[in-house]
Amino acid sequence: MTLWRPTPSDIWQGRDDRAEASNALRIFQTLRQSEHFIPANSGIALMGFASDEGVKRNHGRTGAAQAPDVLRKALANMASHHGHDRLVDMGTFTVEADQLEAAQHALSDGVQACQQAGMRTLVFGGGHETAWAHGRGVLEAFPDDRVVIINLDAHLDLRNAERATSGTPFRQLAQYCAARQREFQYACFGVSRAGNTQALWDEAGRLNVTLVEDLHFRRDALSTLDAVLAQADRVYLTLDLDVLPAGEMPAVSAPAALGIPALDLLPVIEQICRSGKLQAADLVEFNPLYDREGQGARLAARLAWQIAHWWA
């Protein structure tokens, strides 16, 4: 498969505690690695999308292309509990030069193949351009189902641009659905009115996007989520790490001045994971160039750890 590489074996390393007990295991010891892109009929396919071309096109801070393996390393040494032995590392899709669209197509095909084989997909971006590819792959895999997109994000990412960027994925997914006379079901939780122009707010209204603003997150998120999940056959969850406060997550292209603390996000993530409807999830916009002593990587990896643990 072009634009794809297996994950180097030295990425998955950590402390070995098996001398204490046979079940004293960590992620690096229970995760399976695939040397070839051959989807299984079950499990969680962990994939990377090493891209910041979309961030570059959107005039953001580049560096997210390095994120997938940094996040793998941060996850590797965490304890392995229920659900983590389902993880299968299916490698990373890469962008050659500025050929973002080709890489997005490759990731989309890979996601579709995994989903149709019986796997669910967990993708480490990369910028939020990851979502156009990941979301399209899920929609292609389930053409007759109501796939609801839930975005935990300070930004709507409904920009109108000549080329795909990290700011356009949900407009692209809306256009994809419209071309197929398919309902576009999109909810954005944690969105910042200060971080989105009136034009973007108007576009969200035109597309009937469900919104929970950052200021009202604690009050409204869980009740709104109940209504969103009731409309879904399957859910694609995309977590833009810039939804977190800059103090918790400095390592993103656009750090949040306000943001939603991780302890407030986690009940929402848990409810989605335990709904039985979660089909796909990703974490995007992590930029290791701006991390502080690995703080952001560890938090992002912990969020991924929780998703895999809670995923029903």
From Swiss-Prot:
Keywords: Histidine metabolism, Hydrolase, Manganese, Metal-binding. The keyword Protein transport does not apply. It is an enzyme of class 3 (hydrolase). It catalyses: N-formimidoyl-L-glutamate + H2O = formamide + L-glutamate. InterPro entries: HutG (IPR005923), Ureohydrolase (IPR006035), Ureohydrolase_dom_sf (IPR023696), Ureohydrolase_Mn_BS (IPR020855). Mn(2+) 2 binds at D153, H155, D240, D242. Gene3D superfamilies: Ureohydrolase domain. Transmembrane segments: none annotated. Its EC number is 3.5.3.8. It comes from the Bacteria. GO terms for biological process: L-histidine catabolic process to glutamate and formamide; L-histidine catabolic process to glutamate and formate; putrescine biosynthetic process from arginine, via agmatine. One of its GO terms (molecular function) is manganese ion binding. Mn(2+) 1 binds at H128, D153, D157, D240. Pathway: Amino-acid degradation; L-histidine degradation into L-glutamate; L-glutamate from N-formimidoyl-L-glutamate (hydrolase route): step 1/1. Its cofactor is Mn(2+). Binds 2 manganese ions per subunit. Disulfide bonds: none annotated. PROSITE patterns: ARGINASE_1, ARGINASE_2. The keyword Hydrolase applies. Catalyzes the conversion of N-formimidoyl-L-glutamate to L-glutamate and formamide. NCBIfam families: hutG (TIGR01227). Belongs to the arginase family. This is Formimidoylglutamase. The gene is hutG.
